[in-house]
């Protein structure tokens, strides 16, 4: 049985009844089709498609259209070919639509004629297509031609990067046993439709849904909701959201009427309510809680769930179900609507469980605190709850797994799937007395102030406050809990905070609250978290800078904050003053409230105040006041304080800094002409060291490079040097608040890491740091250069953490920077396809070079010629002469270049690797190909030279070694994909790298395993080998796993010396200079950590 057969069988009985109505909401009569007209239009389309499509494989047809009267007939027409329909939303970002079409390898797309110009303009830059000369009524058929099977998109790159392991993460182990019976999507008529997940929690997944998977949903809901030909069902979901399939086919397979309205009407609550419940008398509504909330509590109570409503069935799903308290407040007196909680995931399309709220609970005056259970499995569905070890959970907390014999879908590149496959949902639940209660998604479980918190709890408590119409909570930048409120009345924030304090534990109280007119929602009807984050960013930016006009005003406002946060008695006339000797902890404060007070004071003063937290926790109100006065009102202190401010988003940016000009510092070293050479030493990921004219610098310093791999250093510059004691940490530097710090993990051995400083970039930092050591007026100085997804490149002083300059580029930055041969320029790639050349002492833009796609590859400098080499996702490698501001040569490498080029001095070769799996050796002077080898799978890892060999990691889990003439010497097999680049030891005897199997590996130069160390997550970053300077024979290795842990190992044995956890994911690679480790983090910060040995006061 198929979906179309289900409709055909029903339609034959109800040919003259209304099947579909489309109401544009313009006070004109709706357009309606009977079942007879529906089938006739579908049949005409299917004949047209059969005549003009030559599939030659899996039959899938894209459908690019807006909701309209023809929508059901178009879907039926495609299904009757038979083929699967693949909906494409014209309002989606073109990059997402392109990714979807490419990933599905769609050969045909039906485009609604009204959307033709939009389709062409959105996709002409990345697609080659020919329009079939024959058109069909309101549709045009496009045949797509994908060049060489490749279209480079940002999403595609992200998907390639993670697809290998993601599928294994989501399919349970027992599903992969060979004896299982399989479902094969290549069988004729197997597939019904193809969708993609939203991508809000990662890379969008392609989900191909068989008829056998979705049919049980249709059959069960028809029975559960008791659907008849008298019912009217509303198409609330967009085609790209799989609940739309249930809405369409439950209606059309029952002889009922399907009501469709334009997308523009769905965002107008009053008009939508009028159309649904006055004009058409809708009887069955399946929607997300967010869509329902948009009506507002008054409209819900008076119309949607009134005593006389037409609505028989309300099924809420796709998000956490509202609390019973809220639900009961929405119901008008005498309402009899049946209300269901339905739950499911797109990967097991569409719904998995249902629970009807008992009438006696809805009518009860007793307040129910417990959440609503998920209920029973739907027809053919199996639900399991497992702990982190995969064992069944009968009581307690675990993750939901969903499946069933035929309830299986094909994810991404899967062609066959074992029947009964169970998919991990990422949703956590509690099992109590045999019932399952939803807790939240994995990403809604956060660790805050050292305690586990489900942010859904905050939303539930806030929503139950009488002043709150609706609300949402976000974990902004993984560091601030923000409550967004749509209010019924004018609100005073302090009143809400006081109410929340009565019902929430201290660690669950929001950091901030924003009042908004309405909650933004996605096209799927869910709360749009990314839009909320933008609203909060705008809210922060719009806050006026607080300028205190004297110490008296500070004292008054400090009194107000003190009383407000401690919930002291209200004083309308402000006559009750807080005694000056009051101590915060003795007055009802705690460590969490002290954090809020600190945040409010820093917002009041517009700057961070070193040492204030300790004063709040240990001293009197007067001491707090005096500490602030000293920091804010003394010019010297104010100047010092601004230099170390990390909370930049709460203060106005310096105009010079925003323009990329140097802020607060003179030039880092003399501003030479482009042709003149500064003496510099540059360190970058993988222990790569570049020494450029550094003889004078090294002589001045009386020292040399850290022990590390020197393959980029001209032999004339390599020397054996003494160690350097690092500068002592600046006593004025203040550690950031504890809840934002990384924390050393218990059990660290003989070594520790301590935060020296951190610098806020505004968004995730995936690039790796470049450290440049130079002499400024005969005084050595080291600068960290790094870019972030905030579009900015920062130059930061290594010792103090002081920002030397910031420069805003045109888009996100994932590329790591390199230094020019003269030392005067920093070169970095950008998502907008440009390569930027910036002056190293000021950040001023010196030159930009344009490629045809994103540049994520990190540039490399040729120390002999000064040429800059870089790869682009436009599949070309480029050689740039930055002094002449010209491209010397470019070469098509037959695949996008994500990894960084590698320069070999002997022989003089340039090595490049592509996502198409090619490793190329090029002539650096001309760009001609010396040789190329196919590695079979994408190469994200960057090539690395040592002795007479070159090695590189591959996503098939292999570390490959070649000679400089291109002969493969050996292949080492890791247990998972390798994205990490190799790091070579100082003696060039060992090679270190990480793998997605969660291990750090050490191989001999001959490709034999020396040791491997298991971390707690995937190892994406490149390790860094260095020496423990007080004991120069103590060789160490620093590496990072994606869960934010930094690992310091003994490089000869793999023995753990220390581990430290950052408060965010890490894809940046560490770089170590002397005893300071620098790395970027996805919590928006660059971190510098001191390596401490034995006695914590002695640095490594």
From Swiss-Prot:
Induction entry: Has been shown to be up-regulated by a lysine-rich diet. However, levels of expression have also been shown not to be significantly changed even when diets differ markedly in PQQ and lysine content.
Binding-site residues, ATP: 197-205, 427, 441, 526
Positions carrying Phosphoserine: 651
Annotated GO biological process: amino acid activation for nonribosomal peptide biosynthetic process; beta-alanine metabolic process; fatty acid metabolic process
One protein family per Pfam: AMP-binding
UniProt similarity note: Belongs to the ATP-dependent AMP-binding enzyme family.
Name this protein carries in UniProt: Beta-alanine-activating enzyme
Species of provenance: Mus musculus
